């Protein structure tokens, strides 16, 4: 697992729902990424819909995958 120093935190919007609790997110900088829910969001049964604004964490080593850590209201 990556250290906290190696993660990049960005915001974006859910563009598409993919199978297996994966999502296509369009970041604020215009870059699309594939993301999955973090464990606490899965345990809390938090669901995402198209158009939701989210905060994602990305590894500095793979900028195509991300983890959704927060859904904005």
Curated annotation (Swiss-Prot):
Pfam families: eIF-1a (PF01176). GO terms for molecular function: ribosome binding; rRNA binding; translation initiation factor activity. Residues 1-73 form the S1-like domain. PROSITE patterns: S1_IF1_TYPE. Keywords: Cytoplasm, Initiation factor, Protein biosynthesis, RNA-binding, rRNA-binding. The keyword RNA-binding applies. One of its GO terms (cellular component) is cytosol. It comes from the Bacteria. Transmembrane segments: none annotated. It is found in: Cytoplasm. InterPro entries: NA-bd_OB-fold, RNA-binding_domain_S1_IF1, S1_domain, TIF_IF1. One of the essential components for the initiation of protein synthesis. Stabilizes the binding of IF-2 and IF-3 on the 30S subunit to which N-formylmethionyl-tRNA(fMet) subsequently binds. Helps modulate mRNA selection, yielding the 30S pre-initiation complex (PIC). Upon addition of the 50S ribosomal subunit IF-1, IF-2 and IF-3 are released leaving the mature 70S translation initiation complex. Component of the 30S ribosomal translation pre-initiation complex which assembles on the 30S ribosome in the order IF-2 and IF-3, IF-1 and N-formylmethionyl-tRNA(fMet); mRNA recruitment can occur at any time during PIC assembly. Belongs to the IF-1 family. HAMAP family: IF_1. This is Translation initiation factor IF-1. The gene is infA.
């Amino acid at each position: 697992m990556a250290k906290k120093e190696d993660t990049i935190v960005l915001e974006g919007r859910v563009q598409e729902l993919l199978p297996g609790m994966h999502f296509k997110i369009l970041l604020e900088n215009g870059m699309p990424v594939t993301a999955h829910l973090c464990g606490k969001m899965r345990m809390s049964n938090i669901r995402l819909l198209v158009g939701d604004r989210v905060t994602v964490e990305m590894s500095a080593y793979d900028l195509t995958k991300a983890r959704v850590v927060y859904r904005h209201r």
